[in-house]
């Protein structure tokens, strides 16, 4: 507990029950250091029917549809992604939460406990998955493309409906 007394931020990514069993849950640690900011990253959140499950990036990639989508786009058999999007997305969402908590702690003087579920961070970061789940892939943002023009290459990245409106405007 000596480390906790002087700690600024604690980051852990166990299943939600592990830190409590070790006596290291936020409620206990906050008694030692009320300014502590704790980030907990789990696969499926701290409550709910899947919260007990351990998670690894390939599991999250599969359950969010990333593996299926990549396989269909490339006409390949399903395989894990070459990068760990689930870990990266959860970490970035966690970082935003921690930075916000630091600002709040500077104003209020107390820390916070931030919880990030890898599955939530991954689903809500990949808008293409959401469009696919809603059955509206053809109305969502289109992939960007580089076009050769007389004045040089031009990148177009926009919602296709908005682009059509702009192109037909005088």
Regions found by a protein language model. Give the residues of each.
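A structured beta-alpha segment of the ubiquitous adenosine-cofactor-binding alpha/beta core
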Residues: 1-31
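Structural scaffold positions in well-ordered secondary structure
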Residues: 11, 29, 38, 57, ...
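Short glycine-/small-residue-rich Rossmann-like dinucleotide-binding loops
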Residues: 15-16, 42-43, 64
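Structural detector of well-ordered beta-strand residues that form the stable sheet scaffold
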Residues: 37-39, 155
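Generic beta-sheet signal
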Residues: 39-41, 56-62, 69
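Acidic, glycine-rich segments within the central catalytic cores of soluble metabolic enzymes
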Residues: 47, 61-170
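Conserved NAD(P)+-binding/catalytic subdomain of aldehyde/semialdehyde dehydrogenases
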Residues: 49-53
């Amino acid at each position: 507990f000596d480390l906790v007394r002087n700690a600024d931020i604690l980051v852990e990514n166990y299943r939600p029950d592990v830190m409590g069993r070790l006596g290291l849950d936020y409620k206990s640690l906050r008694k030692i250091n009320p300014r502590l900011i704790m980030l907990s990253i789990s696969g499926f959140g701290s409550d709910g029917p899947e919260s007990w499950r351990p998670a690894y990036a390939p599991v999250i990639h599969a359950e969010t549809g990333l593996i299926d989508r990549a396989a269909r786009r490339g006409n390949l058999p399903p395989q894990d992604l070459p990068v760990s999007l689930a870990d990266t997305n959860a970490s970035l969402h966690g970082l935003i939460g921690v930075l916000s908590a630091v600002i709040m702690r500077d104003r209020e003087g107390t820390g916070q406990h931030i919880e990030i579920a890898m599955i939530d961070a991954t689903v809500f970061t990949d808008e293409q998955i959401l469009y696919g789940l809603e059955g509206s892939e053809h109305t969502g943002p289109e992939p960007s493309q580089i076009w050769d023009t007389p004045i040089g290459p031009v990148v177009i990245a926009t919602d296709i409906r908005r682009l059509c409106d702009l192109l037909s405007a005088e």
